[in-house]
Amino acid sequence: MKRLITTAGLVLSFACQLFASDRTALARVTVYWPGEGSGKSAAWNGARLREDHCAVDPKKIPYGSKVIFGDAECMAVDTGPDVVKRKAARSLGRTPAERNAIVIDRFFHKKQTALAWESTHPHFMMVRIRATAEATN
C-alpha cells in the first residue's frame, strides 16, 4: 500500500510539471482601457475583455497563459501591433535588456484605474509566465 501511494504521488508530481511551465522574463508593462482606440469592448478575437486580461505577443507568450505580476495575475487573451513590435520597450529602454524586453499591455475598465496602477509600478518589471498545456497547443 505504501508503494502504491508513493508511486501515485510521484506520478502526480511529474504530471503537474508536464501541464504547466513557469518562466520569468523582463517586461515593459503598459496599460489600456476601453475607448483608447483599441480594446473598446473586445479583444482581437472577439472575446470580452476583463480586468484580469492582458495583451501579449502570442509568439512569445501563448494565449491562455497566466502572466503574474507582483500584485496581480492576468490571462493572455489579446494582442496588438505595438505589443508585437515592442514599441514601448524599444522607445523607453535604457539598457539592451530593457530594449529587448517583451511588452505586456494590461487591460483596465477605467482610465483612472489604469493610470493609477501605471504610476505606482515601474515601467520594466520581472513577470512570471505560466504557460499551461492548453495554452501551448
State what each model feature region is.
Residues T7-A15:
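Bacterial N-terminal signal peptides
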Residues F19-N137:
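Solvent-exposed, well-ordered loop and adjacent helix/strand elements within mature globular domains
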Residues M1-L4:
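Positively charged n-region of N-terminal signal peptides that target proteins for export
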